[in-house]
């Protein structure tokens, strides 16, 4: 087999290559190492097709100085930065997924093999929130085989643009349930993003997994700053001010204390 566009030394099915490499029989083949490129074509719910910096089964990439995307970023593995972990973190799920797919080839009986669950986040996958706001997310998942499902929420903090994510995950309530909540950090700035992922895994043969990534974009920091800048300068000590502000949709409450 001759592949158009490949270099001569990569034409491993050519007559010349087979003559110079007698250990290969005529119909043997070599599996090439471009699996990660193919994995980007699979809709896993991680949304890596939208942006290479998000990360997914095909790895996670950063923008290099020449503007091209390359594997120059790392994910944390055992507390250390590891550029390969952007890919290897998914290997168990990938292997189980393709093992289950191989079972589909053995029997035409649907019930004889495992199938991937589906999951959607009720609130949507692109949200906006203000610093200090509590976000609650509900995962609605089903399994075509009726398998039991395990839920795990986690923050893909290496993919965040919120600078505080360098310190690790934001605290979450309900990480191992279908409903999770967290508070947007007070120091988050307008435009910062926080990536939350729900992983749903079934208990069938070759456990199959599906994900849904929710990206929370921070908005409202400037509104909060404006609110405090426009408050009257003089207030009675220990007075409690409550009400609403025309430039901000949420009600506010704060205490003025004497200095």
Q: Regions from the language model: what does each represent?
A:
Residues 206-221:
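C-terminal edge beta-strand
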Residues 1-138, 142-168, 191:
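N-terminal acidic, glycine/proline-rich low-complexity segments
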Residues 120-122, 155-189, 228, 238-240:
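Low-complexity "stalk/linker" and mucin-like segments enriched in Ser/Thr/Pro/Ala/Gly
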Residues 127-133, 235-257:
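Short, solvent-exposed loop/linker segments at the N-terminal edge
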Residues 127, 139-145, 157, 186, ...:
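Extracellular acidic, Ser/Thr/Pro-rich low-complexity tracts
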Residues 112-125, 149, 214, 222-229, ...:
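Proline-centered linker/hinge motifs at extracellular inter-domain junctions
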Residues 178, 202, 211-213:
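Extended non-globular C-terminal regions
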